[in-house]
């Protein structure tokens, strides 16, 4: 949005600052959207795994401030606000291990890494702090257990996602990646082979259930955890956004574009026929999205801090007479112990 001073002759004596939308329309600063009820999803925002990863990197950055360089392999969590905050603290984010000098401090992200990355880190003499979400670690252990027992492991997930890359690198044998029901029909393996599946933790429950059903139909002998690999926080946020989307005219899902779980929230809101938009922050909001909306729903992906939710509410309050309430939903009280620092 850019601020533009309106011509007094046009506005017949009143004026003030007008705001230009992305499509070129103008809106007066104030209550131009009228009375609007904002409904906040419960739960929303940080999950226990993200909270653990963020607090871990905070602790590491504080401990080694001014004495050793701190690196993080990939984004600690998939959220631009969080990553930029750590950059201001001096944390260096890298995309490959060769960018980390020998003897430095390295933090693994919440998404986990392959066994090869762990071994290379040891060879370089790095001080490693592993902030992998414990629920992702659980999937890693399942893959290792199935592989050791002679199963061909099938991973349901999104190609290129950091969590998927780390999970596929837990064993030396190939792991088959399945992204959709069509991929199930393309699996080349003997029909009587020992098969086991695991899933990425941040998938859509509905889509994953469909894929698992397709796997069981084609391979009746396949074993796996059903939907138990999809983390509790992902399930809770998806259930909440489904319910909330049926109450509102517009849904604002706060999260970065590379956040898998945030994108699933967006998809689910749209599936309920709500107008839905994924935003990194209030700066991405186009007021034209909200014209005619009497109820606006706000949710946030598991990597998005609550401050971003509050900033969106504050921004909407500049342009509407707001009433804010939180929907009924699950209260989360789970915490994960931080990794020990040497």
Curated annotation (Swiss-Prot):
<keyword id="KW-0479">Metal-binding</keyword>
<feature type="binding site">
    <location>
        <position position="261"/>
    </location>
    <ligand>
        <name>isopentenyl diphosphate</name>
    </ligand>
</feature>
<feature type="binding site">
    <location>
        <position position="78"/>
    </location>
    <ligand>
        <name>(2E)-4-hydroxy-3-methylbut-2-enyl diphosphate</name>
    </ligand>
</feature>
<feature type="binding site">
    <location>
        <position position="260"/>
    </location>
    <ligand>
        <name>(2E)-4-hydroxy-3-methylbut-2-enyl diphosphate</name>
    </ligand>
</feature>
<feature type="binding site">
    <location>
        <position position="260"/>
    </location>
    <ligand>
        <name>isopentenyl diphosphate</name>
    </ligand>
</feature>
<feature type="binding site">
    <location>
        <position position="161"/>
    </location>
    <ligand>
        <name>isopentenyl diphosphate</name>
    </ligand>
</feature>
<feature type="binding site">
    <location>
        <position position="47"/>
    </location>
    <ligand>
        <name>[4Fe-4S] cluster</name>
    </ligand>
</feature>
<keyword id="KW-0004">4Fe-4S</keyword>
<keyword id="KW-0408">Iron</keyword>
<comment type="pathway">
    <text>Isoprenoid biosynthesis; dimethylallyl diphosphate biosynthesis; dimethylallyl diphosphate from (2E)-4-hydroxy-3-methylbutenyl diphosphate: step 1/1.</text>
</comment>
<comment type="function">
    <text>Catalyzes the conversion of 1-hydroxy-2-methyl-2-(E)-butenyl 4-diphosphate (HMBPP) into a mixture of isopentenyl diphosphate (IPP) and dimethylallyl diphosphate (DMAPP). Acts in the terminal step of the DOXP/MEP pathway for isoprenoid precursor biosynthesis.</text>
</comment>
<feature type="binding site">
    <location>
        <position position="161"/>
    </location>
    <ligand>
        <name>dimethylallyl diphosphate</name>
    </ligand>
</feature>
<dbReference type="GO" id="GO:0019288">
    <property type="term" value="P:isopentenyl diphosphate biosynthetic process, methylerythritol 4-phosphate pathway"/>
</dbReference>
<feature type="binding site">
    <location>
        <position position="259"/>
    </location>
    <ligand>
        <name>dimethylallyl diphosphate</name>
    </ligand>
</feature>
<feature type="binding site">
    <location>
        <position position="259"/>
    </location>
    <ligand>
        <name>(2E)-4-hydroxy-3-methylbut-2-enyl diphosphate</name>
    </ligand>
</feature>
<dbReference type="GO" id="GO:0016114">
    <property type="term" value="P:terpenoid biosynthetic process"/>
</dbReference>
<feature type="binding site">
    <location>
        <position position="133"/>
    </location>
    <ligand>
        <name>[4Fe-4S] cluster</name>
    </ligand>
</feature>
<feature type="binding site">
    <location>
        <position position="260"/>
    </location>
    <ligand>
        <name>dimethylallyl diphosphate</name>
    </ligand>
</feature>
<feature type="binding site">
    <location>
        <position position="303"/>
    </location>
    <ligand>
        <name>dimethylallyl diphosphate</name>
    </ligand>
</feature>
<feature type="binding site">
    <location>
        <position position="201"/>
    </location>
    <ligand>
        <name>(2E)-4-hydroxy-3-methylbut-2-enyl diphosphate</name>
    </ligand>
</feature>
<feature type="binding site">
    <location>
        <position position="78"/>
    </location>
    <ligand>
        <name>isopentenyl diphosphate</name>
    </ligand>
</feature>
<dbReference type="GO" id="GO:0051745">
    <property type="term" value="F:4-hydroxy-3-methylbut-2-enyl diphosphate reductase activity"/>
</dbReference>
<feature type="binding site">
    <location>
        <position position="161"/>
    </location>
    <ligand>
        <name>(2E)-4-hydroxy-3-methylbut-2-enyl diphosphate</name>
    </ligand>
</feature>
<keyword id="KW-0414">Isoprene biosynthesis</keyword>
<dbReference type="InterPro" id="IPR003451">
    <property type="entry name" value="LytB/IspH"/>
</dbReference>
<feature type="binding site">
    <location>
        <position position="111"/>
    </location>
    <ligand>
        <name>isopentenyl diphosphate</name>
    </ligand>
</feature>
<comment type="similarity">
    <text>Belongs to the IspH family.</text>
</comment>
<feature type="binding site">
    <location>
        <position position="261"/>
    </location>
    <ligand>
        <name>(2E)-4-hydroxy-3-methylbut-2-enyl diphosphate</name>
    </ligand>
</feature>
<keyword id="KW-0411">Iron-sulfur</keyword>
<dbReference type="GO" id="GO:0051539">
    <property type="term" value="F:4 iron, 4 sulfur cluster binding"/>
</dbReference>
<feature type="binding site">
    <location>
        <position position="303"/>
    </location>
    <ligand>
        <name>(2E)-4-hydroxy-3-methylbut-2-enyl diphosphate</name>
    </ligand>
</feature>
<feature type="binding site">
    <location>
        <position position="78"/>
    </location>
    <ligand>
        <name>dimethylallyl diphosphate</name>
    </ligand>
</feature>
<feature type="binding site">
    <location>
        <position position="259"/>
    </location>
    <ligand>
        <name>isopentenyl diphosphate</name>
    </ligand>
</feature>
<protein>
    <recommendedName>
        <fullName>4-hydroxy-3-methylbut-2-enyl diphosphate reductase</fullName>
        <ecNumber>1.17.7.4</ecNumber>
    </recommendedName>
</protein>
<feature type="binding site">
    <location>
        <position position="261"/>
    </location>
    <ligand>
        <name>dimethylallyl diphosphate</name>
    </ligand>
</feature>
<dbReference type="GO" id="GO:0046872">
    <property type="term" value="F:metal ion binding"/>
</dbReference>
<dbReference type="Pfam" id="PF02401">
    <property type="entry name" value="LYTB"/>
</dbReference>
<feature type="binding site">
    <location>
        <position position="111"/>
    </location>
    <ligand>
        <name>(2E)-4-hydroxy-3-methylbut-2-enyl diphosphate</name>
    </ligand>
</feature>
<feature type="binding site">
    <location>
        <position position="111"/>
    </location>
    <ligand>
        <name>dimethylallyl diphosphate</name>
    </ligand>
</feature>
<feature type="active site" description="Proton donor">
    <location>
        <position position="163"/>
    </location>
</feature>
<keyword id="KW-0560">Oxidoreductase</keyword>
<dbReference type="GO" id="GO:0050992">
    <property type="term" value="P:dimethylallyl diphosphate biosynthetic process"/>
</dbReference>
